Amino acid sequence: MISKEKKLELVLKFGGSQKNTGDTRVQIAILTEDIESLKKHFAVNKKDKHSMRGFIAKVNQRKRLLAYLKEKDFNAYKQTI
């Protein structure tokens, strides 16, 4: 999990304002940070199968959001990646 401060930083960077948490780019950024932190967790805890399920769900959610963003606003998609 990422800290509240890190989430706020991502919201301000990708969303523009503190209240713009539902923006697709913000959601993708938060999921990416979560995924990166979970990668470190799985490097140490290889047998944690329960958390792996949640990790895969986050990866799939990010994949769907990226596909949506690519379809709706290609320039924002390129900036996000």
Swiss-Prot record:
GO terms for cellular component: cytosolic small ribosomal subunit. GO terms for biological process: translation. The keyword Methyltransferase does not apply. GO terms for molecular function: rRNA binding; structural constituent of ribosome. One of the primary rRNA binding proteins, it binds directly to 16S rRNA where it helps nucleate assembly of the platform of the 30S subunit by binding and bridging several RNA helices of the 16S rRNA. Belongs to the universal ribosomal protein uS15 family. This is Small ribosomal subunit protein uS15. It comes from Mesomycoplasma hyorhinis.
